[in-house]
């Protein structure tokens, strides 16, 4: 589920040389320079007779990463050792194994550091211990490779003591939990939970005076929203042990006693040692900030007699909607709880009747319970289960690459947990169905996947060796888990970007771009495919983690426990590998037999189809010939039909529009011919008349009258005028004639 299969390219280069870097040699040398009392603890407490184990050792996390660089806290030198995981200028060239930067504290902490925590703005690092807290300011970067102060070997860093006077004056108080306020837009604030059951919020601008204070003890006695059995918890002295922030949400108006507008705030989930969870809302957007009313304890469904354990130690809110809380107990139990919105039940309705300011309390639905194998359960533990009981505090770590996965670190090793049902839960909550039984079916069908990554306590007689650092590299170098053991050995394990079942990849899942997609591959992607069935069979519920060898070379473990350890590993290989592979083999053989029978049946069907295809081809040829003949006959019939229709249309008694127009034109032709004949006769008569006149004019006659020149001129002018008059009259007559004729 956590480990990635196959190479990841150039990103594997740094994974090969990092364990051999000189910084780990320096840290191991610093470990040898501890006080003799601390160095003699393992030797005096470990013997072949296996005496009782010492009290719990504090779990540390002294490692974090930023921008392709790994920061390791050097307790002896009160400094960070910075190792670049990338080569020069971001390339894949392996850097020198002796090259690193040292960030030295100007004002080193006087208390032991148990945890380092990077701020959301990535400009400060919190140095957390049980007796104090400091904020280290990271120096500026410049240069070609963007190193601190251009790549100096040693860089001085300023530190800001947080609540220094408070911890100095209150020597009996201890710091239980610390976390940065999750906003990246505001000035850095850090939230502290101390052993006096008080949560204080400090700003780096005023590190000695808390910005806000949440007194949990008084809230237990004076809160207006309490269940009936809460009065007994104060007398038992139950205190908060951890808290975590959820994603930013919008809260109601009366949460911060604001009447004009709603506000956005971060939900703060507070876990008590008895397993109860409280909720409040924190908003520092506007100075001096707002703290909502403390709600709780949040009801847990389904109810349990032991309230799901009395040794709760850690809480984690996964970044999803609805919020999913992970509650861890020292006995190794993990509870995955879905935060449901509050509903008005009888108890809350009664309380609201006398308290109008009371809000609905969200409830926790315990979706599933998971038990971690903190220490390896050997064969002898079955006879005496109380002899092998082991419990220790658990630290929960988010996975920045996969929101549905988180990791658990404790004194005996590291586990990875993947929640594969989150997307189905979102689909169920987003639907309009009111059937709650499907949710129960979902919890019964698919559980989370737990993988035991590292075991630092393989034998009962060995002391726990808690890891000193844990970090997930979310950089482009590839998602990778880095674990720093108690002896400063670096263990690296690649991670997948998504949650997958803890089963090996099948050959049929390999992608081949040259092979076309076949119907069998399409069937393999179905929800009920045989491939998924084989994956479910091969799914492992346990695994053999990486075992951390003991640093005590002179003391050999008892042979009985070594045999039990080998027997346990053999049993895991037998039950989780060989047996499951045998079951998968039987299923595959059964499947192959069925497929062979189907193949024979399909071959018979194929032969039958070939014969049918042959007969169909012959029939098609015959039908083609008949079709050609029928087509020719049809064409002849069509031609005959055209002739018949033509003759039929010609003999129809009803004339068409064109025929009626032609008839009218033909009826007008005789009248036009008659008018034209009359016009021709008139023209002929005029022609004859003019010819007679011309003959008379042309015939020789003796002039009887002699006219003078003046007379002739007058006569010519008169004739000319009369001729023009006659010409106009002829023209008018022709126009009238043309107008009358046509």
From Swiss-Prot:
GO MF: structural constituent of nuclear pore
Species per Swiss-Prot/TrEMBL record: Rattus norvegicus
Highest taxon listed in the record's lineage: Eukaryota
Pfam families, per the entry: Nup88 (PF10168)
GO cellular component: nuclear envelope; nuclear pore
Residues carrying N-acetylalanine: 2
Function as written in the Swiss-Prot or TrEMBL entry: Component of nuclear pore complex.
One Gene Ontology term from the biological process aspect of the record: ribosomal small subunit export from nucleus
Protein location: Nucleus, Nuclear pore complex
Residues recorded with modification Phosphoserine: 35, 380, 438, 518, 541, 699
Key word Mitochondrion present: no
Keywords, in A-Z order: Acetylation, Coiled coil, mRNA transport, Nuclear pore complex, Nucleus, Phosphoprotein, Protein transport, Translocation, Transport
InterPro entries: Nucleoporin_Nup88, NUP88/NUP82
Stated name of the protein: Nuclear pore complex protein Nup88
Coiled coil regions, renumbered to chain: 597-652
Major localization listed first in the record, in broad terms: nucleus
Complex formation: Interacts with NUP214/CAN. Interacts with NUP62 and NUP98.
Annotated stretches, region: Disordered: 34-54
